[in-house]
A protein has these predicted regions:
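N-terminal leader/targeting peptides and immediately adjacent processing regions
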Residues: 1-42
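Amphipathic alpha-helical binding modules
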Residues: 95-130
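Amphipathic protein-protein interaction modules
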Residues: 67-109
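Amphipathic alpha-helical interaction modules
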Residues: 40-83
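Conserved phosphate/pyrophosphate-binding and hydrolysis machinery centered on Walker-type P-loop NTPases
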Residues: 27, 31, 52, 56-60, ...
Length: 130
């Protein structure tokens, strides 16, 4: 596992399942998409402190920060987790199924994927239709 990014292996799915949106944005740069994605996540994950936004975020750095933020939400802000998920627009049914079918160790990873997928769609739509 990479010492700089301990979540690199965990988020191997990111390049295959979220980043394809980038191919649909030929006139916009991947870097712009990633900057907007990171900013959207930082905004929507309140009360978790995201930290400083990167001038040049990578998919891996976003994934690592997101995994940490989700873990903090689960451990320290569990009563506001539902509000965050509602604000991001992840269905209650989807979350219930995820929680019931996933081991506690994998919940933050699966939940992070749901958040990332939804936020990436939101950013992609804004970039494509504004």
């Amino acid at each position: 596992m990479n010492a700089q990014n301990p979540y690199a292996a965990t988020f191997a799915w990111m390049n295959n399942e979220v980043i394809p949106y980038l191919d649909q944005l030929p006139e916009l740069s991947h870097a712009e998409f990633l900057r907007k994605l990171e900013a959207q996540l930082a905004k929507d994950l309140y009360p978790v402190e995201w930290g400083e936004l990167s001038a040049e975020p990578t998919a891996q750095s976003i994934a690592a920060k997101l995994q940490q933020a989700v873990q903090e939400l689960i451990q320290n802000h569990n009563n506001t987790l539902g509000q965050v998920l509602y604000r991001i627009d992840i269905s209650e049914g989807k979350i219930r199924r995820l929680m019931a079918s996933t081991t506690p160790e994998k919940r933050s990873e699966k939940l992070a994927f749901q958040l990332l997928e939804r936020e990436a769609k939101k950013v992609w739509l804004r970039m494509n239709y504004r």
